[in-house]
């Protein structure tokens, strides 16, 4: 695999973030299964929980291969912990619809956006395990699609409306923007634009949830730009 020596640690740290996201998704899907309205949804969520656990192990293996010294690192991302907190609060209220919005639609959308970008880079670098990577990405797409269908069915049945979902999504989307901002130095170290990654997250959202306002990331200078501004002042 043609990964530059100076790219290994940033990519490993990015995978560490994804690993922790997969563990959060695993815990959430198991809790959601207990709230599922029917046996088919329950089976899907339990299957998702198992898949998320496998994904976390896959990311661990990739981290161990790229930068073994960083295996077991905990990403310092207060936004991810805050995301976990408000998601747990929704689970405690038995609010299945909000948890589907937060986990399957928004968080899986973030993961899918990042994985899609990473996959493009890995293909260019002739990375191994292409079939495994494609399966992982397909499963993420399946989880995301499940959440969208569940919410669209709830809207069709009058149990919730798009305006309510957009309002509830605001805090979660703000936190995903903060996560990308916190990782911006990693993106730039592998010649990627964090603003483009943040905007990708919006592209994976359903039309009824997208906001016309640009994400917070697009209004922020990049880490490199910030350093240049400081140097000039």
Predicted regions mapped to residue ranges:
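Non-heme di-metal
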Residues: 1-225
